[in-house]
Every structure is written in structure tokens, then in C-alpha cells.
Amino acid sequence: MFVIGLLAWLPARTQQVNAQVIEEIRTNPQGARAGRSMIITLADGRVYPVNYLREDDLVFMGIDGRWWRAFQGSGEPVEMLIQGQRLRGHAQVVLDNPEYVVDVFARLRPKAPSWLPLWLNGKLVVVTLQPD
């Protein structure tokens, strides 16, 4: 019975926390949370807060939920809000280059234990920014 209750409670709690994080990023774009988290809007309109790492014209994010599947194959266009700046790009999940994933996650998630199996460390999604 406990598991059923937890499964019912968890999505609602996640939605509530995500809404609070999104509001904080929007209202305090120079704050600590906005320095490490962005708001991403998918092509279908879904919106998520997610940690990111920006390097030149690439934005990296590690996705722990199942929504990384939206970026399989040829990927999809996304819109991001990073520290008050609206950016557009094309996002694609990296499934076939474990060395690249480990390299990027070392910078994106430096506190993740090194013994953690790659499949537990989420999926790496790379966004190539569109020029202004």
C-alpha cells in the first residue's frame, strides 16, 4: 500500500518542486540557482528546470527522467532560458559515445560518485545553439 501511495504522491511533488524552481529562475536570473539551472521548453510545450553546462555554442544537460526520449534520433528544437537570456537550439541525446558522456559529466556533474554506473547517471543531451 505504501508503494502505491508513493507512486501517486511523487509526480505531484515533482511538479510542485519544478514549478518553484522555474519561478525562482525566472524571478532571480542572476541568482545561484539560475547559475546552474535553466528552463527548457520542448517542441511539444513541456517545460522543465534542469542543470546545465554551457561551453561556447553547446549547452549540456543530464536528464534523469524519461523525457530524454524526446531527443532520440535526429533530436528536436528547444528553447532555453539561461540567466535571463532566451536561447534557441537543437537538442539530441548522446547514446553511442560513452567516453564523451563521461568527459562531459565530469564537468556537468562533478560531485557524482565515480563508481556510479553510467546508466544511473542519467542521459546526456547536447543542445547546439542557433545563432542570433
Predicted regions and their residues:
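N-terminal Sec-pathway targeting helices
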Residues: 1-2
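Short, conserved active-site entrance elements at the starts or edges of catalytic domains
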Residues: 7-46
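A short linear-motif detector with a strong N-terminal bias
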Residues: 17-20, 31, 39, 57-59, ...
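Short, flexible coil/linker segments at or flanking structured domains
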Residues: 26-28, 40, 47, 59, ...
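Short beta-strand segments
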Residues: 31-64, 88-92
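Short, structured beta-strand-loop surface elements
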Residues: 66-132
